Amino acid sequence: MAIVVTITSGKGGVGKSTTTANLAIGLAESGKKVVAVDFDIGLRNLDMILGLENRIVYDVVDVMEKNCNLSQALITDKKTKNLSFLAASQSKDKNILDKEKVAILINALRADFDYILIDSPAGIESGFEHAILHADMALVVVTPEVSSLRDSDRVVGIIDAKSNRAKKGMEVHKHLIINRLKPELVANGEMISIEEVLKILCLPLIGIIPEDHHIISATNKGEPVIRTDCESAKAYQRITRRILGEEVEYVEFKAKRGFFSALKGIFS
């Protein structure tokens, strides 16, 4: 039975879709059968990050409205064994989703995959509640900014109140991904520190992605950065291993001496 992992955020533009794409590839390359599902109806871009935009014929709404069957809509990534993709509709209204149709889709996917990664709309947008409804695990992507943290705190509350697991008295395993970290700005007091982020959101940390220009270049080429050897690629690989249950040390990025010693202390 598949594990449903919803990748979400409190606001848009924090790297949620990029994170979904790279973790989907990481899990697939670890031997897991993975499907990445784009639930961001009307604003899809997961297809471009994966380099699959030219292969879309049917989308998730077509499946739910029975315009096609699921196998017709699923796209197999030719570059990554074990990875499939289900695109969001670019033209339909987000309100077209309903709980019954979403449940049918997720149950069908559970039968065939080890991991279902859902790229959720941001928490302030319509459709968010459908994306977190069936989550076993939620990865909350934030940037070290006040607005991102504030909106993400609201998202955590919705997950704890409205997911199916929460309604059954079970916990959705929530973890924090801090994206676009600039250690030099933290060291200078110009960016919120990791320790402060953890205190504000009270979620366990599963990974830190440093600011990296390679991500922009990779996205523009439709080649997810995890396939490269840059620092952000290694960060996504470490998060993948943690999702799979490995204990992976948190590494030091280049910054003023002493900055990451505090981080190490949190996990010692």
Curated annotation (Swiss-Prot):
Q: What Gene Ontology terms for biological process does this UniProt record contain?
A: division septum assembly
What CDD domains would the database entry show? MinD
The UniProt record lists the keyword DNA repair: no
Q: Which GO terms describe its cellular component?
A: cytoplasmic side of plasma membrane; cytosol
Q: What is its main location?
A: membrane
Q: Does the keyword Plastid apply?
A: no
Q: How does it sit in the membrane?
A: Peripheral membrane protein
Provide the protein's localization: Cell membrane
Q: Source organism's superkingdom? A: Bacteria
Name the UniProt key words of this record, in alphabetical order: ATP-binding, Cell cycle, Cell division, Cell membrane, Membrane, Nucleotide-binding, Septation
Residues that bind ATP, according to the entry?
11-18
As one GO molecular function, the record gives: ATP binding
Task: Please state which protein family the record places this protein in.
Answer: Belongs to the ParA family. MinD subfamily.
Subunit-level organization: Interacts with MinC and FtsZ.
User: What the protein does?
Assistant: ATPase required for the correct placement of the division site. Cell division inhibitors MinC and MinD act in concert to form an inhibitor capable of blocking formation of the polar Z ring septums. Rapidly oscillates between the poles of the cell to destabilize FtsZ filaments that have formed before they mature into polar Z rings.
Give the protein's recorded name: Septum site-determining protein MinD
